[in-house]
A protein has these predicted regions:
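Sec-dependent signal peptide recognition
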Residues: 1-2
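Sequence context surrounding c-type heme c attachment/ligation sites in exported
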Residues: 5-183
Length: 183
């Protein structure tokens, strides 16, 4: 009984993140993912996926790249995501810090800096709305860093079933790596 009351109370404040997810939930660098709040299923369950389109194998320093996060999951009523770009070279003094800038190009995506100093791109309230029950995408721009080593992108996305509870939502994570151009 107490557990049910605690879960019911959590749904009104902790779990509902229509404006933005809490920073630091991409699943990368030891961070939790959306699964820490959206309970009931394993990460990457039931054949869905989240991918990042537009990440180059090799980036040119300072270049602007259009990127898109794509979530595919059946029966998605609402959805959200969080992405970060961080230095990945363990020998690099910048390891784990933000690499470049993720910039909004529309009202569906914005960014927030966490207490750890890392920048996170994520959905807005407008970005929760799906036009298809099987997929949703969010577009933004990544400005490649001017210095440093390889960059790893971590993304987590939540396929919500629309019942205003944290239960039975589906969470997906993925990552992509990009290396500096040899030019």
């Amino acid at each position: 009984m107490v557990v049910a009351a605690a879960i019911a109370g959590a749904t009104t404040t902790d779990i509902s993140n229509p404006e933005k997810p809490p920073p630091g939930h991409t699943g990368g660098f030891g961070e939790p993912s959306c699964i820490s709040c959206h309970l009931g299923n394993d990460v990457n369950a039931f054949g869905g996926s989240v991918t990042i389109k537009g990440i180059p194998d090799r980036f040119i320093r300072g270049k602007h790249y259009p990127i898109t996060v794509v979530l595919k999951a059946e029966e998605t009523e609402v959805a959200g995501f969080q992405i970060t770009a961080r230095y990945n070279g363990s020998y690099d003094a910048l390891y784990g810090k933000s690499a470049g800038e993720i910039r909004s190009i529309n009202s569906r995506v914005t960014s927030t800096t966490g207490d750890n100093g890392v920048s996170y791109g994520h959905h807005t309230a407008q970005g929760l709305v799906t036009s298809s029950r099987d997929s949703i995408s969010w577009s933004m721009e990544w400005i490649a860093p001017l210095k440093g080593s390889s960059v790893i992108f971590h993304v987590a996305a939540n396929s919500g079933n629309g019942d205003n509870s944290p239960l039975s939502d589906l969470v997906y994570t993925s990552n992509e790596v990009s290396h500096p151009s040899l030019q």
